[in-house]
Structure formats: C-alpha cells, structure tokens
Amino acid sequence: MDQAELARIFQMFDRNGDGKITKQELNDSLENLGIYIPDKDLVQMIEKIDLNGDGYVDIEEFGGLYQTIMEERDEEEDMREAFNVFDQNRDGFITVEELRSVLASLGLKQGRTLEDCKRMISKVDVDGDGMVNFKEFKQMMKGGGFAALGSNL
C-alpha cells in the first residue's frame, strides 16, 4: 500500500483533521464499520499503537497498525490456499484419504498408509470428528505442519 492510500484511510479515522486519532475518533470510526469495542479495550489498543506515548494515534503509528492488520490477512489467505490443497473435495475438512493422497503426490514417506494418516490427523483433531477443519489446520501449521507430525510415527 502506498503512502497516499494510507493517508486517505487515516483521514477517515481522523475526523477533525488534526493529524491524530483520539480514542473517541477511533471508537466512532470502528462503530461506523459495525465494530463495537468496549472502552477499556480501546484504551489498550491505543496504548499498544501509541509509540510516542502522547495518548493519540498519529499517521506513523497508524501505518504500523495497518501493516500488521494486512500481514495477518495475507497470512490467513496463504493458510487458506494451503488448506485447499489438502481439502480436495472442498467440503471444509481434510480427511484421512485426502491427506494420504496429497502426501503421496508430494513423494513424502510420512503418511504412506491410512494408519499413519489417521495417527497424524488424530494429533490435531481437537473436536474428535476424524478430520481436520481449517482452525485445526492453522494450529497444526504453526507447529510445523503434517511433516512434523509424521516425524515420530
């Protein structure tokens, strides 16, 4: 994102145009977007963003916040793409058969048998349905992925 676009977004939050976003301006802007945050949480949010400690969010501080939001969104998109590689029928779950198929196509020795794949899935299957949903997949990927799960089979 270029600086001009960031400045436009900042100006939408900076209602009075004084170059800084107050707690009230942040609250009003978020509410206009349909986001309602309790007052104490808003204070904490500003304290995290407010690097110079003046009690306001200026354009530089806002840029850091916006960058963090965008990076998290990009990571989520990457994670979704990876999940979709395994979720071959696009039903929102990775089954034992789908896992075995993908691992085999990658030429990995982990997961050659259905039993291996069942064990791998059971290590991350929080809800016990025998499949991996997107939330479970994200948790697993943060721990090293399916290959890490298979290393101690």
Swiss-Prot record:
Domain of life: Eukaryota
Binding site for Ca(2+) 2: 50, 52, 54, 56, 61
An example molecular function term from Gene Ontology annotations: calcium ion binding
Residue positions binding Ca(2+) 4: 125, 127, 129, 131, 136
Gene3D superfamilies, per database record: EF-hand
Keywords on record: Calcium, Metal-binding, Repeat
Pfam families cross-referenced by the UniProt entry: EF-hand_7 (PF13499)
GO annotations of cellular component type: peroxisome
Positions of the EF-hand domain: 1-36, 37-72, 74-109, 112-147
SMART domains xref list: EFh
Family according to the record: Belongs to the calmodulin family.
Physiological role: Potential calcium sensor.
Record-given protein name: Calmodulin-like protein 3
Species in which this protein is naturally found: Arabidopsis thaliana (Mouse-ear cress)
This protein's encoding gene: CML3
